[in-house]
């Protein structure tokens, strides 16, 4: 492994952590109808737990309404149950051909809970990124011995890994800040 490969691997792992954070934040309700809100839901469908987006489409015709249209009408009851049982606090109404979900405005208490959840997810993301940095630094130590890197080269490589880490932590903070503004805004 070369230093470039180590940097690329570190970036790749940190990018994955950022994507997990994005996915977690997308599942938080902000008071606006957003189809991503339901993407993480699993539906009991013919005995298996299936992601909602594999058996239905979710659209937002207006800022306060989500419409879930299943490709299999028999699955609507199961989808309705999954939405009711989720911790999103949503109440779908079954109109026969689709589920209509009115997104109620967030209460102040719920906003505070969501902001706490955003901060928790952001902290988990930062911790994951720092763990990746630690692993990269451990690999760098081994690599420095293998490649007989000088102390200066090793320090430069450590600084580069720290720069990558700072970049991804800043991105995680930006995602969290944006989500907080969405919730409070």
From Swiss-Prot:
Q: What are the recorded GO MF terms, alphabetically?
A: ribosomal large subunit binding
Location (main, coarse): cytoplasm
Transmembrane intervals: none
Record-linked Pfam families? RRF
Localisation: Cytoplasm
GO terms, biological process: translational termination
InterPro entries per the record?
Answer: Ribosome_recyc_fac, Ribosome_recyc_fac_dom, RRF_sf
Keyword annotations for this protein, in alphabetical order, are: Cytoplasm, Protein biosynthesis
Task: List the GO terms this entry assigns under cellular component, sorted alphabetically.
Answer: cytoplasm
Q: Does the keyword Protein biosynthesis apply?
A: yes
SUPFAM superfamilies in the record, alphabetically? Ribosome recycling factor, RRF
Record-stated family: Belongs to the RRF family.
Summarizing the function annotation, the protein's role is:
Responsible for the release of ribosomes from messenger RNA at the termination of protein biosynthesis. May increase the efficiency of translation by recycling ribosomes from one round of translation to another.
Q: Which PANTHER family match?
A: MITOCHONDRIAL RIBOSOME RECYCLING FACTOR PSEUDO 1, RIBOSOME RECYCLING FACTOR
Q: What is the protein name for this chain? A: Ribosome-recycling factor
Source species of the chain? Thermus thermophilus (strain ATCC 27634 / DSM 579 / HB8)
